[in-house]
Amino acid sequence: MSVLEENRPFAQQLSNVYFTILSLFCFKLFVKISLAILSHFYIVKGNRKEAARIAAEFYGVTQGQGSWADRSPLHEAASQGRLLALRTLLSQGYNVNAVTLDHVTPLHEACLGDHVACARTLLEAGANVNAITIDGVTPLFNACSQGSPSCAELLLEYGAKAQLESCLPSPTHEAASKGHHECLDILISWGIDVDQEIPHLGTPLYVACMSQQFHCIWKLLYAGADVQKGKYWDTPLHAAAQQSSTEIVNLLLEFGADINAKNTELLRPIDVATSSSMVERILLQHEATPSSLYQLCRLCIRSYIGKPRLHLIPQLQLPTLLKNFLQYR
């Protein structure tokens, strides 16, 4: 009992220390929020000089210098789509390529928020269209992740690289995995390699099959993606069978997927399909039924035309019915 009484003062002192730390934290947070609101008020009201002074004191930078703070006024304006505030800050001389500790630029923020007008303003002011974060993410990757075809098109027009090294995050794979087929369509129109394989992800077609994104799978196959290329020895058909996606399995088979392809474990697509499932029945039926002559002819002609020239099929001097047939329409 006496031991508890001796320890009580120390416990009270310790609790007082924690209470003091918490109070200081809350006070600093209140000050920061107040300054941010005040800075925004001055920007909106057009008092550029006062806004610049508050921003410089708050973020510890001067006009024209890069920001290594966690967030700069440009980042906030771009992420929230506040075009007027963004233009005001740029007119004050703030660095359009200001970065955070993770190398995130205002352009990254604008694209992630699908703020096309802000992205255009930043690009016109000289923003680095191929800026890379510490994680290897580009503004184009953010646009495709968000599903913003307008931002993606804008970035490509300003010189964004549609595909980078295989070790960096891929806009194509991101669009395919999230089902953003409009972004994928734009990337394809800019000449990406639809069969780009990233070691830990596989090809865009494989990623789309794993995510069961039918429209993206159709876009990739229509653009000439190799129906056999997946992740290592796993084919897209393995992925579709594993996900029990009958619609995707039928589509892959229509484009010539090999049902006898084996992965690293020597398993065929039918072996990874759920037992007694519809996918298993489809694969068994396809295995027992030879491909029709017209399907084999279509695959042969498309292969002869070649992936880079498939988009020219509508220009061939052929009957419309035959052109539609070659385009799976």
Swiss-Prot record:
**What organism is this sequence from?**
Homo sapiens
- Residue ranges of the SOCS box domain? 278-329
Domain of life where this protein originates: Eukaryota
Encoding gene, per UniProt annotation: ASB5
- According to the UniProt entry, where is the signal peptide? none
Q: What is known of its domains?
A: The SOCS box domain mediates the interaction with the Elongin BC complex, an adapter module in different E3 ubiquitin-protein ligase complexes.
Q: Where are ANK repeat segments found?
A: 69-98, 102-131, 135-164, 167-196, 200-229, 232-261
**Name by which UniProt lists this protein:** Ankyrin repeat and SOCS box protein 5
Query: Which keywords does this Swiss-Prot/TrEMBL entry list?
Result: ANK repeat, Repeat, Ubl conjugation pathway
Query: What is this protein's function?
Result: May be a substrate-recognition component of a SCF-like ECS (Elongin-Cullin-SOCS-box protein) E3 ubiquitin-protein ligase complex which mediates the ubiquitination and subsequent proteasomal degradation of target proteins. May play a role in the initiation of arteriogenesis.
Q: Which Gene Ontology BP annotations are present? A: intracellular signal transduction; positive regulation of protein catabolic process; protein ubiquitination
Family as reported in the entry's similarity comment: Belongs to the ankyrin SOCS box (ASB) family.
- What Gene Ontology terms describe where this protein resides (cellular component)? cytosol
Please name the pathway.
Answer: Protein modification; protein ubiquitination
